[in-house]
Structures are given as structure tokens and as C-alpha cells.
């Protein structure tokens, strides 16, 4: 997992013309950072970074980073569920895209409620094909959830993601959701998700 600063994330988003939330307490910025150093290789590892930045009750900035994947695992890249191919979220800012809900009816997570753009890769090789001609926009169940109950975190993505944004460690995810619930109490049940490439970080 690569590490960044809150200031880098803010500068990157604002440089792209995206909204960086600077309002009152728990006005959260949820930003996934996809590891560009691996290119289009399917690593099947949790080598991306989920970041959350916000002001606390005292108006002080807080910043958290978590190990995650923003890519589908090798299993679903080879065992495709959708005839058009496995889904890979396209970098961008998706305003109000997620709400607190039940992931697969099991536990609370951030669930997709508005359209996202995804690339579709259907050739089952060892690389993600990020072809603009394959891009689809819609509601595909791209949730933000956890891999499982592994104390030290899951090391391989495998079946944990067919396109979802997935935390490696349950404890990290639980901490994330505590922040989300605090934000929900203040701002309502609507969350913006932003995905950028690490090569875009200022």
C-alpha cells in the first residue's frame, strides 16, 4: 500500500476540478487511490489505498489511510459473471453515489445507489483492459465493504471483489464505518466516492 498526505489528496482533487469537502465536522472525503505502479497487471493483492479526510468536532483535520483493492480479483476476472466482462471502476468523482446499506444483506457497508462508470474486461487474461470503448455507466452493485474477519487482513483478493472497493482488514473497515455513521448523523445518508490513480497524486 502506498502512503500519501491529506494535503496531496486535496490538491489532486481540486486540480481535477473535483469537490473536496471542507464543511463542518465529519464532512468526509472518501477517496480511493489505485496503485499505478502495477500498470494493468492483475496482481490479486490489496495494493491500493482508501483514504478518508474530514474535520472533527474541534475543526481539526483528520486523515486516515487503509489497505484496500479498487480492482476485481483474479477469480472474477477469469470467471466472468457479466457477459460484457468484469467491472473495473473508472477513475472519477461520483457525487452522492453511495449510502449506508446492507452488503449482500449481511452487514452494514457503503452500497452503490447512483450510477458509476466501469470498464468491462472480458478476455480472461492476466491484465485489466481499460478500453474506453468498453465503458458502461449504471448501478452495478459496486459497494465499499470488507474482505472478511481476518485479524491481519486478507492478502489475496480472489473472490472478495468482482468490482467492489474492498478493505483488507475488518478492523480498518469497522473504523471506517464508525466515521461514516458519524457523518451520516450530521449530513444524511449520501456519500460521494472519488477514485484517482496514484500517478495523479500531486
Over which residues does each language-model region extend?
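Cell wall/extracellular polymer interaction/catalysis modules
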Residues: 1-158, 172-181, 187-191, 198-200
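Residues immediately within or flanking Cys/His clusters that coordinate Zn2+
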Residues: 161
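Cell-envelope and extracellular/periplasmic
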Residues: 169
Amino acid at each position: 500500500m502506498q502512503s500519501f498526505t491529506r494535503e496531496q489528496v486535496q490538491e489532486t482533487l481540486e486540480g481535477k476540478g473535483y469537490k473536496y469537502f471542507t464543511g463542518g465536522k465529519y464532512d468526509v472525503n472518501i477517496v480511493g487511490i489505485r496503485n499505478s505502479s502495477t500498470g494493468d497487471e492483475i496482481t490479486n493483492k490489496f495494493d491500493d489505498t482508501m483514504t478518508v479526510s474530514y474535520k472533527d468536532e474541534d475543526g481539526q483535520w483528520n486523515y486516515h489511510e487503509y489497505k484496500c483493492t479498487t480492482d476485481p480479483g483474479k477469480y472474477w476476472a477469469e470467471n466472468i459473471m457479466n457477459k460484457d466482462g468484469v467491472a473495473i471502476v473508472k477513475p472519477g468523482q461520483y457525487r452522492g453515489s453511495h449510502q449506508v446499506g446492507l452488503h449482500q444483506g449481511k452487514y452494514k457497508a457503503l452500497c452503490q445507489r447512483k450510477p458509476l462508470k466501469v470498464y468491462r474486461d472480458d478476455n480472461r487474461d492476466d491484465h485489466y483492459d481499460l478500453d474506453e470503448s468498453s465503458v458502461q455507466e449504471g448501478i452495478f452493485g459496486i459497494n465499499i465493504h470488507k474482505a472478511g474477519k481476518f485479524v491481519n487482513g486478507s492478502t489475496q483478493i480472489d473472490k472478495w471483489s468482482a468490482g467492489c472497493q474492498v478493505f483488507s482488514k475488518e478492523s480498518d473497515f469497522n473504523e471506517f464505518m464508525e466515521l461514516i455513521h458519524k457523518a451520516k448523523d450530521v449530513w444524511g445518508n449520501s456519500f460521494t466516492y472519488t477514485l484517482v490513480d496514484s500517478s495523479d497524486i500531486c
